């Protein structure tokens, strides 16, 4: 690990602090996930799915949108790995 010459020494061991920071590429992955939630409607859908699993029709009713519009947002969230889905009989539930 490189030596860091800090302008102020506050008594902390900078190497111990830096060991806790994930690699830069991990932050790029996290930033990408946050970008997917940058659309307020998509964030509302995500919030709903954090609390329950639901079908497209119920999500659409809850956020006052058409089912195709909700499907589009679900597709983006699923493609980015933020949510998943499972089949229950003829229903496809987003989780």
Where are these regions (language model features)?
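Alpha-helical residues within the helix-turn-helix
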Residues: 61, 72, 78-79
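N-terminal leader segment of winged-helix/HTH proteins
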Residues: 1-37
